[in-house]
């Protein structure tokens, strides 16, 4: 009964639990690859004149009555950003010793949170930063940054940390996203809709910051903000299993864990929007570097609305029943060449069957994703992969979805020319103006299993299909090359010392 109460409270059915335990039992299949996507194959790199047309298409779209939303996943704690500094606090030496520690203290006055940290040091240790460093008390400085009695950066989400310095003060990523939203996502009436997914314990802090700052950004950019929040739903938590694939129990209680960013497909599905931009909270730059980001956001949005317009026209034509063989061939070309969706079976179909197939493929949510040229190690990236219905389409895959024991697949992964910076624009209504139910377009067979421990006991955790991976598997997907300058994530605190964040 305790189990049943917990399930009821979370809104999880027993059938879901059975399904999840079966996933632990049988694992997840690897995806069959056709090729790594490249500029010749699946990634658009529009020439200057084409870019102009796409930018114009976006400007025209923004001036209609459509609803545009900027969606920013922002629930994760920033603790990973400070992993090295937490290790320094626990180390058996007092002075900065590793390269990381030295870089942090050498650049300390360059951080946007320096002034706040100075105040916290005085409050906690009675001295400012130079004073503490001068007497070799480096750990007091780090403690003031990370601990609750100080700035509490070790427990806050990235969106609320000071990232960038300006003449008039410092900005958090939340504020940088508000600025960005005004620059490329303002609708006809100058309204900017920004939606953050946050964790329950931080929601109030986000609200306070918005209440404090939204007015000044609205004034600066001549826009009106509509800022909303949601939380990951408890019903998307997944059950943990023991090594025998039985439900893991912690003191007799079933253990549930958050299902990863794939759970946010539910939050996305709840938005009332026509077009949704998605970008991670920590991928922001100061205003002086925003031009590229804004240009390429408008560009991929322009590609999206241009493709959507053509798709809708073809769907209307197929609906009318009044089309020629040549028109059906034209639509097939569009699906294969513009939407990169191929099916070896299509050549055997009569026109009427082909029309049904095309209608099914066209009438789906659509996304255009920016892709950046690989500079370092291959990571998650763009591939042409086989779907369960035998078609080949574009997918964003993580390395865990690729069979590295298969030489051909491994080579495709290693030779991949581009990676996924998480830079998407999504179209979520059909040609009749109805919202797609996004839950219907998830490929459930694309989750993955990770190994964790709880109180010293090993457990298996189930990650849902990633938001831009399997959760959007059955969308029409198009990739566009964007420059590295649009990708500036902050993985560690010292990333803030990089030129792009100064």
Which residues make up each language-model segment?
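Long, compositionally biased intrinsically disordered regions
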Residues: 1-39, 186, 349, 353, ...
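Domain-scale recognition of functional cores that engage charged ligands
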Residues: 5-7, 11, 36-375, 384-396, ...
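Conserved catalytic alpha/beta cores of large enzymes that bind or transform nucleotide phosphates
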Residues: 127-135, 148, 153, 282, ...
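Short amphipathic beta-strand starts and helix->beta connectors
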Residues: 178-182, 406-409, 464
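C-terminal, active-site-flanking charged/polar segments
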Residues: 276, 386-421, 430, 446-451
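Polyanion-binding interface signature
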Residues: 372, 381, 407
